[in-house]
Amino acid sequence: MPEWLEAGIKVIPVVASVALAIRMEQCGASAVVAEGCESGGHVGEMNTMALVPQICDAVNIPVIAAGGIADGRGVAAALMLGAEGVQCGTCFLVAEECVIHENYKNKIVAARDSDTIVTGKKFGHPVRSLKTPFSRAFAKMEQSDSVTEEQVMAFGAGSLRKAAVDGNINEGSFMAGQIAGLVKSIRPTKEIVESMAKEAEVLLNNAKNRLQ
């Protein structure tokens, strides 16, 4: 990190715990992304609601919330938890400009609230993805005492590319967050961002009315 900072590069690590956030601040990070386990891809153990305020209280650099955010409600909630901003992933995978395979986008749009699964916990590399023939087979494989870590890792090698590039429904790892069930359509990035910002602004402006 020192080399990057000396070069004038802003370093904003993704963290899944208070301890790691503090460590990153000590190392000179410009900000941290507090990512809850609702996120797609590699995840930690704490959810966003619990993680973000604890990290906000523990560090003196900006905190960006991530995990389970796909609309203005999530943005407003994150700001109320103390975050300076948000990082979104799943909702932008279905943006018109995103170059992933259409099968990937369509699977996210079709997903329900319970359609994700976390695999890789056994070997310390938990990943959240959509439930597919591949992810179910991976989960079953890692639960077997007769299968080694090397065999499991070999089974999963290249699976993200098979999803994102090839659109392989059976062999691809379609990483996505639990918020996938809230993503209902493929839209331009501009529309996604503007709708999130507008909804968040309305909610925050009207928040005091909920206390009356």
Q: Where do the protein language model's features map onto the residues?
A:
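Alpha/beta enzyme core
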Residues: 1-64, 71-90, 170
